[in-house]
């Protein structure tokens, strides 16, 4: 078995220090315009950003999506993120726990999260390919118990696996049958998330038919995992690197993925993530159809700089979110979901080509 511990460290190193953010891709969020209200009818001080994340109340409609864990230095990053998200009342997801299930010495880098963040929602994480490889209820329960998780994310990453030097692109349909059966035995909800290439309406409908109602778009336009694996291929002299260059813009852009999932599965719980880099991006994602926004890479980079840097990052994000809410007259998160928007450019073209009627969608995104 490849050394997945070292692979996790290399992934974080490349993500944090190489140019892989939004490389050759776009979120399409620039095509989402929040309509300015010159007289908002509210005061900044009364804006309420609280919302629900399954059974728990959270302070802002933003979560940290899973990215890291597996070795001591990664555990230190997880500890910083957990301490700060606990302070701000923000849910936190961890990276894939496969490494901790298969290597006991990696468990503490994940377990530390709940030790320093006793109250916020924590989201466990395993990969869909592991279901094909033999994972079942036992491994899911282990991942959940390891961090006393409030939910578990199951990540889809076929594009990353295809170009990864040691990739395992295994996505047979019986993995969904296993996931459906496992979900019936778990005490916490399952969120199916992508890994930088977005969820299409076809995938959302398929997952929904197997009982999945919670999604995380992780759309194109943020951390480019094909680029990360391309860099790893280059370092190893792997011929896959040349092929990976042709796929750097592969995927469903984040804004399009939010629309596709919300339109095809209207009653879903939806995290809009992938290239969310500001509070304004988060506000756009929520107004477009997400329940909350998610981000990973900018959190990772700030955490590497230290706890104070990450705290300042979240203060900035929350201020920008509240500014967008103020300027749209949205006194709370539900109002933000119903605020007036205009969809332009490539996103409008995408929606129309994919059969999404914009007038109908406006009602769907508002949950009317």
UniProtKB/Swiss-Prot annotation:
Enzyme class: isomerase
Chain positions recorded as Mg(2+) binding sites: 161
Key words, A-Z: Cytoplasm, Flavoprotein, FMN, Isomerase, Isoprene biosynthesis, Magnesium, Metal-binding, NADP
EC nos: 5.3.3.2
Positions that bind FMN: 65-68, 96, 125, 193, 218, 223, 275-277, 296-297
Catalytic activity: isopentenyl diphosphate = dimethylallyl diphosphate
Cofactor needs: FMN; NADPH; Mg(2+)
Binding annotation for substrate: 7-8, 96-98, 160
The keyword DNA-binding is annotated on this UniProt entry: no
InterPro entries with a match to the protein in the record: Aldolase_TIM, FMN-dep_DH, IPdP_isomerase
Main location: cytoplasm
Keyword Cytoplasm tagged: yes
Molecular-function GO terms, alphabetical: FMN binding; isopentenyl-diphosphate delta-isomerase activity; magnesium ion binding; NADPH binding; oxidoreductase activity
Subcellular location: Cytoplasm
UniProt GO BP: isoprenoid biosynthetic process
Superkingdom in the source lineage: Archaea
Example of a GO cellular component annotation carried by this entry: cytoplasm
Subunit text: Homooctamer. Dimer of tetramers.
Function: Involved in the biosynthesis of isoprenoids. Catalyzes the 1,3-allylic rearrangement of the homoallylic substrate isopentenyl (IPP) to its allylic isomer, dimethylallyl diphosphate (DMAPP).
Matching NCBIfam families: IPP_isom_2 (TIGR02151)
Family in the record: Belongs to the IPP isomerase type 2 family.
Record protein name field: Isopentenyl-diphosphate delta-isomerase
Organism, as annotated: Saccharolobus islandicus (strain L.S.2.15 / Lassen #1)
Gene that this polypeptide is encoded by: fni
């Amino acid at each position: 078995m490849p050394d997945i511990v070292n692979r996790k460290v290399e992934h974080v190193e490349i993500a944090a220090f190489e140019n892989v953010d939004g490389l050759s891709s776009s979120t399409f969020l620039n095509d989402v315009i929040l309509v300015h209200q010159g007289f908002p009818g509210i005061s900044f001080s009364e804006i309420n950003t609280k919302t629900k994340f399954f059974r728990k109340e959270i302070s802002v409609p933003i979560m940290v999506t899973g990215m890291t864990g597996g070795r001591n230095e990664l555990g230190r990053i997880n500890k910083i993120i957990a301490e700060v998200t606990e302070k701000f009342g923000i849910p936190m997801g961890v990276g894939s726990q496969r490494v901790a299930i298969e290597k006991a010495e990696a468990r503490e880098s994940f377990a530390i999260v709940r030790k320093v963040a006793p109250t916020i929602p924590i989201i466990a994480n395993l990969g869909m390919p592991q279901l094909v490889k033999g994972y079942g209820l036992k491994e899911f329960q282990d991942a959940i118990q390891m961090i006393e998780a409030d939910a578990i994310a199951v990540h889809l990453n076929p594009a990353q696996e295809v170009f990864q030097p040691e990739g395992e692109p295994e996505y047979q349909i019986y993995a969904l049958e296993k996931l459906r059966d496992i979900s019936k035995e778990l005490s916490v909800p399952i969120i199916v998330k992508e890994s930088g290439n977005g969820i299409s309406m076809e995938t959302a409908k398929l997952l929904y038919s197997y009982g999945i109602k919670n999604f995380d778009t992780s759309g194109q336009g943020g951390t480019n995992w094909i680029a990360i694996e391309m860099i790893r291929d280059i370092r190893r002299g792997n011929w896959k690197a040349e092929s990976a260059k042709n796929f750097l813009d592969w995927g469903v852009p984040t804004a399009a993925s939010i629309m596709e999932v919300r339109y095809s599965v209207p009653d879903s719980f939806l995290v809009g993530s992938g290239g969310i880099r500001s509070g304004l991006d988060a506000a756009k994602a929520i107004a477009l159809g997400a329940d909350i926004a998610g981000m990973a890479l900018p959190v990772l980079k700030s955490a590497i700089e230290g706890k104070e840097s990450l705290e300042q990052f979240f203060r900035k994000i929350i201020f920008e979110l509240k500014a967008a809410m103020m300027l749209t007259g949205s006194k709370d998160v539900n109002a933000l979901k119903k605020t007036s928007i205009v969809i332009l450019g490539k996103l409008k073209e995408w929606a129309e080509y994919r059969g999404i009627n914009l007038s109908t969608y406006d009602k769907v995104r508002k949950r009317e």
